[in-house]
């Protein structure tokens, strides 16, 4: 793609997210969501492959329908109560319709079916954008109206998403689909805390983005799309192998890595609010997710393909990729647990 067109599309996508996150009016928030969607669709379909075309069509239909539902809920609320302010959503139908629309945009269960198929049909960097940046605007709108959303809806969606994300990732051999189910599971943890402690939802989102970015950037740098490709990661770089291992374990929530922070705090908050059965079920579903993270970790770091080369030194490809973003992402994804008291103040 022409660099100028690429710059315009990325700038429009960033502008749409900023417009939505800073809006207090329903129309401007909807415009930001639409700008975000229209900017990402050419990026999805730029490979001129049938799978990419199919993914862009699916993405457009899902996002257009959910954006229309967002606008409908705003119009109904304005018609009944005379206010376009996001924080003054008082109609019950508008609350449920808006929550459903934003859950569809995020890919929360049970409206998650589009996310794995779309991530599988696009390049890894495009999948990274969809799994991280495209979640910011809908999540920001949910955080703005957190005190207006019915709590049972968020708890049901959260638990369902963690179950679907954990079970769906178990039998996958495609890494992009695995990351899609990982995204669904993490979004389930976020939405569970939406009406109980929105600050924990924001903390979870802030940690989820660098952890997922680090994992998928290493997949891109090592050209790993399947579990079979993951076996070759050690032949690219020992550093990439180590970071891939740690980023996956951090996504799984193992201490003492950064991914343990949100799970620990969320389970603690659920217990404080007398939702111990909910906390127990979410802890069990976290083990399902950890299972497929450990599976990828074992295959990518502890197994090597057959080799007939009688040399002790393992040969590696010479990398020409830009790795300047990896140190910062690694720092955030791995080493934040000691400053947990500072993050929760």
Swiss-Prot record:
Keyword set, alphabetical order: Electron transport, Membrane, Mitochondrion, Mitochondrion inner membrane, NAD, Respiratory chain, Translocase, Transmembrane, Transmembrane helix, Transport, Ubiquinone
Give the subcellular location.
Mitochondrion inner membrane
Q: How does it sit in the membrane?
A: Multi-pass membrane protein
Q: What is its main location?
A: mitochondrion
Residue ranges crossing the lipid bilayer per the database entry: 1-21, 26-46, 60-80, 96-115, 122-144, 148-170, 201-223, 242-262, 274-294, 323-343
Q: Which residues form a coiled coil?
A: none
A Pfam family it matches: NADH_dehy_S2_C
What's the Enzyme Commission number for this chain?
A: 7.1.1.2
Recorded GO cellular component terms are: mitochondrial inner membrane
Listed InterPro entries: Complex_I_Subunit_2, NADH_DH_su2_C, NADH_UbQ_OxRdtase_chain2, ND/Mrp_TM
The protein's enzyme class: translocase
In alphabetical order, the GO MF annotations are:
NADH dehydrogenase (ubiquinone) activity
GO biological process assignments: mitochondrial electron transport, NADH to ubiquinone
> According to the lineage, what is the superkingdom?
Eukaryota
| Catalyzed reactions per annotation | a ubiquinone + NADH + 5 H(+)(in) = a ubiquinol + NAD(+) + 4 H(+)(out)
Main role? Core subunit of the mitochondrial membrane respiratory chain NADH dehydrogenase (Complex I) that is believed to belong to the minimal assembly required for catalysis. Complex I functions in the transfer of electrons from NADH to the respiratory chain. The immediate electron acceptor for the enzyme is believed to be ubiquinone.
Q: Which family does it belong to?
A: Belongs to the complex I subunit 2 family.
Annotated protein name in UniProt: NADH-ubiquinone oxidoreductase chain 2
């Amino acid at each position: 793609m022409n660099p100028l067109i690429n710059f315009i599309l990325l700038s429009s996508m960033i502008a749409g997210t900023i417009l939505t996150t800073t809006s207090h009016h329903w129309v401007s928030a909807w415009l930001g969501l639409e700008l975000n969607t229209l900017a990402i669709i050419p990026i999805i379909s730029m490979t001129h492959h049938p799978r990419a075309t199919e993914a862009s069509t699916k993405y457009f239909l899902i996002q257009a329908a959910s954006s229309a539902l967002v606008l409908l809920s705003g119009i109904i609320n304005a018609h009944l109560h005379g206010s376009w302010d996001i924080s003054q959503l008082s109609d019950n139908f508008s609350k449920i319709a808006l929550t459903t629309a934003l859950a569809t945009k995020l890919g929360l269960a049970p409206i998650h079916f589009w996310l794995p198929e779309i991530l599988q049909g696009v390049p890894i960097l495009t999948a990274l954008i969809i799994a991280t940046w495209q979640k910011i605007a809908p999540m920001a709108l949910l955080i703005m109206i957190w005190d207006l959303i019915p709590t049972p809806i968020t708890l049901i969606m959260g638990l369902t998403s963690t179950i679907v994300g954990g079970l769906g990732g178990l039998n996958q051999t495609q890494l992009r689909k695995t990351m899609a189910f990982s995204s669904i599971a993490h979004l389930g943890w976020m939405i569970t805390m939406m009406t109980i402690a929105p600050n924990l939802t924001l903390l979870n989102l802030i940690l989820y983005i660098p952890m997922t970015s680090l994992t998928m950037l290493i997949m891109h740098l090592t050209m790993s799309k399947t579990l079979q490709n993951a076996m070759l990661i050690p032949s690219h770089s020992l550093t990439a192998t180590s970071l891939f291992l740690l980023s996956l374990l951090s996504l799984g929530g193992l201490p003492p890595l950064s991914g343990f922070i949100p799970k620990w705090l969320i389970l603690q908050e659920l217990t404080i609010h007398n939702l111990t059965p909910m906390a127990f079920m979410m802890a069990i579903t976290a083990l399902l997710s950890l299972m497929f993270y450990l599976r990828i970790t074992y295959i990518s770091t502890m197994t090597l393909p057959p080799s007939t080369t009688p040399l002790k030194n393992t040969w590696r490809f010479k990398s020409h990729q830009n790795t300047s973003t990896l140190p910062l992402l690694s720092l955030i994804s791995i080493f934040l647990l000691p400053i947990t008291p500072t993050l929760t103040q």
